Curated annotation (Swiss-Prot):
Pfam families: NADH5_C, Proton_antipo_M, Proton_antipo_N. This is NADH-ubiquinone oxidoreductase chain 5. Keywords: Electron transport, Membrane, Mitochondrion, Mitochondrion inner membrane, NAD, Respiratory chain, Translocase, Transmembrane, Transmembrane helix, Transport, Ubiquinone. Belongs to the complex I subunit 5 family. Signal peptide: none annotated.
């Protein structure tokens, strides 16, 4: 066997084994060491990250990809299911990034969750979550991908509902689970179609055999699956609701794991989509609508975690637009750069929330650049990277995506919406920085502000370096897998930067207007629409349920109580008794006085006649 594929396969299988080992040790019936979370889980993830750099280096040097099939799970006459790993461009680049980000999040969680009595179980859940995501990324067939897909789904349910004593956390966990179930219907139906028509779930065979079939139906199922998992418009409300979970969960969920799983599914299977115009147009329009709607919702939110959550959904919409433009490698590049600064934004938010006695309202913050200088600086860096500031990580992916949009002849409506959403990104990002870092403190004076802890500083510092240089490193070392779009005039090339600058100025104007009151009732309809999330949760979660409840009450009262129960109960008994009484009364008319009078008169007459 050639040494290069051997190095790739053995290294990445070793990574998976190292990650599984702490989970297996937790099955030991003996009581665990209180330090198990940091000694086993964090060490395992950091070691796995270092090992995963070896196959990445080999791939960058040799350009070699490999597939490992090492176990036949099930064989029938027409159908085989194998355990098969695909170590290609996507899995070799994504795995180290996921491990690096998770390592930082786990270290931060050791500080954030130190007082939780079940911290070891929490770390085990986070590790299982990561294993499920790596299983999904490295899968070479739909069955194995489905295992990873369901794994991240069930672990997200357990982690979002971690504080299960709170009704909101339970509701959010159920909401995430139910919305993902809707998406899972699409994936299961697509897998059933592939099994019936192509007789294979192996990805290479699907690519080869799909040329002879119209793939519109399974592609719609895959897009539905991605809509549920990656929180696209229509199935998006679970994403902001998931903020009820602990902040490390939000960071892991929104950066490099669950929410990008749907986009990754479409990237992995893009070969069967690239010539299907209906599927591409669906992705383009769905992504544009998601990006604009969620960015508009983020403009007026006051919960710092909700704003970052809506920004995630907006960026996922941008990735979906990129897939619709037939540029999956740009969507993957944005996944990679987005992981660093989004995880860092959540960790900075967690540090601020912890320091302000669990306060999440940005209107009650302010002046933190003096009290939490490191966290505030990293929050600003992350926000700048998110808006696509030149030479930070987000610039290399967002600029390439906007350039591809500007040179595209596709749907101008969708591309215009996406550009507007990009400008909104600058508005809400700068709004967060303004309210959190600038101005004077608006929080209680007795807040236990302290960021001088290595478990806080080190993970945020690592992610800050990633947010600054990751885009440059990835674009410098990895050649595009598809031919890039052609160049454009400098004026058009500057369009992305101009849109971001306009967004920043708009944010400054909005921030200064916040302290000025021009109307007695300043809340406008547009503000209300944005603040109420477009009335989407109210309509979906309340309107239909209220109609069903009203219909049920009418059926229960009018049909059951007033009809069947009345007929079988009091009214039924009375009608039966009335009939019997009528039959009885026909034989005896009830004129007793008349009868007695006639009887007495007859008796008197008879007596009189007898005496004569």
């Amino acid at each position: 066997m050639h040494p290069t594929p051997l190095i790739l396969s053995s290294s990445l299988l070793l990574v998976i084994i190292i990650l599984i080992y702490p989970v297996l040790t937790s099955l030991n019936p003996n009581p665990q060491n209180p330090k198990w979370a940091t000694s086993h889980v964090k060490t395992a993830v950091s070691s796995a990250f270092l090992i995963s750099l070896l196959p990445l280096a080999v791939f960058l040097d040799q350009g070699t990809e490999t597939i490992v099939t090492n176990w036949h799970w099930m064989n029938t006459t027409m159908f085989d299911i194998n355990i098969s790993f695909k170590f290609d461009y996507y899995s070799l680049v994504f795995t180290p990034i996921a491990l690096y980000v998770t390592w930082s999040i786990l270290e931060f969680a050791s500080w954030y969750m130190h007082a939780d009595p079940y911290v070891n179980r929490f770390f085990k859940y986070l590790l299982t979550f990561l294993i499920a995501m790596i299983t999904l990324v490295t899968a070479n067939n739909m069955f194995q991908l489905f295992i990873g897909w369901e794994g991240v789904g069930i672990m997200s349910f357990l982690l979002i509902g971690w504080w299960y004593g709170r009704a909101d956390a339970n509701t959010a966990a159920l909401q995430a689970w139910i919305y993902n179930r809707v998406g899972d219907i699409g994936l299961i139906m697509s897998m059933a179609w592939l099994a019936m028509n192509l007789n294979s779930w192996e990805i290479q065979q699907i690519f080869f055999l799909s040329k002879d079939f119209d793939m519109t139906l399974p592609l719609m199922g895959l897009i539905l699956a991605a809509t549920g998992k990656s929180a696209q418009f229509g199935l998006h409300p679970w994403l902001p609701a998931a903020m009820e979970g602990p902040t490390p969960v939000s960071a892991l969920l929104h950066s490099s794991t669950m929410v990008v799983a749907g986009i990754f599914l479409l990237i992995r299977l893009h070969a069967i989509m690239e010539n299907n115009q209906l599927a591409l147009t669906t992705c383009l329009c769905l992504g544009a609508l998601t990006s604009l709607f969620t960015a508009a919702c983020a403009l007026t939110q006051n919960d710092i975690k909700k704003i970052v959550a809506f920004s995630t959904s907006s960026q996922l919409g941008l990735m979906m637009v990129t897939i619709g433009l037939n540029q999956p490698q740009l969507a993957f590049l944005h996944i990679c750069t987005h992981a660093f600064f989004k995880a860092m934004l959540f960790l900075c938010s967690g540090s601020i929330i912890h320091s302000l006695n669990d306060e999440q309202d940005i209107r009650k913050m302010g002046g933190l650049q003096n009290l939490l200088p490191f966290t505030s600086t990293c929050l600003t860096i992350g926000s700048l990277a998110l808006t696509g500031t030149p030479f930070l990580a987000g610039f290399f992916s967002k600029d390439a995506i906007i350039e591809a949009m500007n040179t595209s002849y596709l749907n101008a409506w969708a591309l215009t919406l996406t550009l507007i959403a990009t400008s909104f990104t600058a508005v809400y990002s700068f709004r967060v920085v303004f309210f959190v870092s600038m101005g004077t403190p608006r929080f209680l004076p007795l807040s236990p502000i302290n960021e001088n802890n290595p478990a806080v500083i080190n993970p945020i510092k690592r992610l800050a370096w990633g947010s600054i240089i990751a885009g440059l490193i990835i674009t410098s070392n990895l050649l595009p897998s598809k031919s890039p779009v052609m160049t454009m005039p400098p004026t058009l090339k500057m369009a992305a930067l101009m849109v971001t600058a306009i967004g920043l100025f708009t944010a400054m104007e909005l921030a200064t207007l916040t302290s000025k009151q021009y109307k007695t009732n300043p809340i406008t309809q547009t503000h209300h629409f944005s603040n109420m999330l477009g009335f989407f949760p109210s309509v979906v979660h309340r309107l239909m349920k209220k109609l069903n409840l009203t219909l049920g009450q009418l059926a229960a009262t009018q049909m059951v109580d007033q009809t069947w129960f009345e007929a079988a109960g009091p009214k039924g008994a009375s009608s039966t008794q009335i009939k019997m009484a009528k039959i009885t009364s026909d034989t005896q008319r009830g004129m007793i006085k008349t009868y007695l009078t006639i009887f007495l008169l007859t008796t008197a007459l008879a007596t009189r006649l007898a005496t004569i």
